Amino acid sequence: MLTVIAGPCQHESLEQSFAIAKHCQEVCHRYNINYYFKASFDKANRSSIDGKRGVGIDNTLIDFIDIKEKLGVKILTDVHTEGQISRCRDVVDVLQIPAFLSRQTDLIQTACKTDCIVNIKKGQFLAAWDVAGILSKCENAEEVWITERGTSFGYNNLVVDFNGLQYMLNNYDVPIVFDATHSCQQPGGLGNSSGGNRDYVPGLTR
């Protein structure tokens, strides 16, 4: 069954996240698609100190509980520290390791000791075959996913290496996720924030 991970990226309010989760759930149900709602309580790697980071872990987890109780959706959120893992593990279904932290051994191993699925976003600086080293840190995990989110291509640009995507599908016995929207990102491309071109997303996801 096809799985879709979708949401507002950054959790801003209960009303907004609930509306997005409800709409995505309805569409995915219509087409028999497995759905995970995704939102972040803290965007800790913004390009600038002025970048909006979110409403924080306390308010977000309260809202996540409300959304799960009312809609029954599965929830994915990213974590940046071991302390955040202990806070989130009983609320969300998937703990996501951000791409910039995809080689952080302690963070990965702590996430893998929970009952959550662990989704590790492959760093923009890693080759497909480097993922073997990441997976070697995940022996105790309930389930692990690897997400392709683009590869650095010079300054402020990413490309998608579909050869690498196929390599991971062929060589790793874990689900491989494709993050089409972040693969079209232009990191720091707007100076104090990242840019991107959403027009490329439909072509990449075909």
Regions found by a protein language model. Give the residues of each.
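N-terminal amphipathic alpha-helix/helix-capping segment at the start of soluble metabolic enzymes
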Residues: 1-5, 62
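Glycine-rich, proline-tolerant flexible connector loops at the mouths of alpha/beta enzymes
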Residues: 5-16, 35-57
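Conserved, mostly hydrophobic/aromatic
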Residues: 7, 37, 88, 120, ...
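A short alpha/beta connector and helix-capping loop motif
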Residues: 17-21, 85-86, 90-100, 105-114, ...
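Alpha-helix-loop-beta-strand connector modules within alpha/beta enzyme cores
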Residues: 23-31, 52-76, 110-117, 165-176
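Short beta-strand segments at enzyme active-site cores
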Residues: 33-40, 74-79, 178
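Catalytic beta/alpha-barrel core
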Residues: 55-56, 70-84, 93-106, 116-128, ...
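Catalytic alpha/beta core domains of metabolic enzymes, predominantly
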Residues: 115-206
